[in-house]
C-alpha cells in the first residue's frame, strides 16, 4: 500500500481555539496513533475563522475508513466539527 495524504475542510460549531484544545489533546494524539493517522497540519481560514483545514497522512484508505465510522463521527462532532460540512480529498505521489 502507498502513503496517502488526506485533506479535510469543514466548519466548526465552536471557536477554532476551543476546537484546537480538543484536537491537540493527549486523547486525540493517542487516537491518531492507534488508527495509524499522522496529522501534518491544522489551521483556520483567514476569511472565515470557523472554517478549518486538517491534513493527515496514513496508509491508503485509512483516513476515509476512520472518518466514516459512526463512533468517530460522534466523537469529532462533540469537539465542534460539523461533520455534514466536511469535504475530503485524497492525494498520492505515485
Q: Language model features by range: what are they?
A:
Residues 1-73, 82-94:
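Short S/T/G/P-rich N-terminal loop/turn motif that feeds into the first structured element of a domain
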Residues 77-79:
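Short, exposed beta-strand-loop hairpins at the edges of beta-sheets
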Amino acid at each position: 500500500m502507498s502513503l496517502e495524504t488526506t485533506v479535510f475542510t469543514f466548519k466548526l460549531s465552536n471557536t477554532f481555539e476551543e476546537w484546537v484544545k480538543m484536537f491537540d489533546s493527549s486523547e486525540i494524539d493517542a487516537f491518531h496513533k492507534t488508527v495509524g493517522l499522522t496529522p501534518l497540519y491544522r489551521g483556520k481560514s483567514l476569511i472565515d475563522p470557523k472554517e478549518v483545514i486538517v491534513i493527515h497522512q496514513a496508509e491508503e484508505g485509512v483516513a476515509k475508513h476512520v472518518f466514516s465510522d459512526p463512533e468517530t463521527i460522534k466523537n469529532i462532532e462533540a469537539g465542534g466539527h460539523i461533520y455534514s460540512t466536511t469535504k475530503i480529498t485524497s492525494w498520492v505521489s505515485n
